[in-house]
């Protein structure tokens, strides 16, 4: 059976509080999230937009590891940790061991191609030698040849961020950006980093994206209307994805 379009759901670990976070994650999976990205607050959130930065501030000081263990017991879909390599590069082996110990499936470092491109092959090897997935983040500023290369080594999917930071608009259309890379990518192409409106989603899917990654809009919805309302958004996005086979 052909797999439908993928819904990748992001949430900052522990946001807005531990219980609400758990409720949202479980509800998201029950309503169609295929993969979870859990954000580990970094020291400097260079490539995150204001909404996600604010969510990091709200959970500062939280002991994330027991929380990850709890979530892992509750859901069966793949879970990827999302955090900055800059914070862990000097203790990468130890960090990856912790990721493995709490039974996460892999890691996504948004700064890998931007700030550590010379170490790409080495870091990819270290991650995979631990038995973890390395999900690679790329963007319109990455050269075509590099997008093509990393699409072949990225695990699960290639994450293509269409905006310079999460939730910040850009002048070029989503369709144009995806048309440029679709033929370069030998992998599942997941589009995110600022998708929020229904028209953005539909544009991405009709241009050939294999799925979407959404986070900012869920954080905003939890802030405004609570967890149940954010779970309803997951359900809504799942229904849109299911229109495209």
From Swiss-Prot:
GO biological process: L-tryptophan biosynthetic process
Coiled coil: none
Primary enzyme class: lyase
Pathway: Amino-acid biosynthesis; L-tryptophan biosynthesis; L-tryptophan from chorismate: step 5/5
GO cellular component terms given for this protein: cytosol
Keywords of this entry: Amino-acid biosynthesis, Aromatic amino acid biosynthesis, Lyase, Tryptophan biosynthesis
GO molecular function: tryptophan synthase activity
Record: active site: 37, 48
Family from the record: Belongs to the TrpA family.
Protein name, per record: Tryptophan synthase alpha chain
Gene that encodes it: trpA
